[in-house]
Amino acid sequence: MKKLIILVAGISFFYGCKKSDAGGGGTTADTYLNTKAASSWNYHETNSSSGTPQNSDYSLVSTSRDTSINSKIYHIYSFSYGGSQYLAINGHDYYQYDSVPGALGQIFERLYLKDNINANSSWSQQIAVSIPGLPVTIPVDINNKIAEKGISKIINGATYNNVIHVSTTISSVAIPSASLTSDINSYYAPGYGLISNTTLVHLDYAGVKQDVNIVTSLNSASLK
């Protein structure tokens, strides 16, 4: 059970920390994913999960490389602190393929954005997680909703238009809902992709307490 709790906390960091679904800008100006080589994004992150805010800056750079995963073409991005990001667009659906901290090396394909559905529309994914010592997989539900669409948002003094706001919650039948609360909000702009993310998760169950409080915002971008 403790491993499951650690996993759920890890999934929260998957949204909120530096390996979030940063990137974007569009294969065209109307999409939310930029695959053009040498495009770059500079982000600022404030991590208050431990109670004391920790600030850091990092950049994401689009490479000239792609790879095929699950019959989709994923574009590869490089982080300034090391490591890669894999993002794909299939029609109007946007995917991230990555390992999740605490998931014991398991890798997931996450549908993080649908740009052609109306505000208040929703979609969900259920991740089947294998926990050593348990004979069955444990389901973890990721619930997404288009909270707002076509809005304008100011981030670090810059105004972005036609922004999509996605709200996300995380739950599991193995953890009582009162013991796991989450409020994850991501904002995407055409021509830029992710411009802002806030991740708030509180977990208090079976003697384990975990808080995730991370804010990520776009400082600047150089799009090719």
Region annotations inferred by a language model:
Residues 1-4, 18-19:
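Positively charged n-region of N-terminal signal peptides that target proteins for export
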Residues 5-9:
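Sec-dependent signal peptide hydrophobic core
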Residues 13-16:
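C-terminal motif of bacterial Sec signal peptides marking the signal peptidase cleavage site
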Residues 18-224:
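Conserved functional acidic sites
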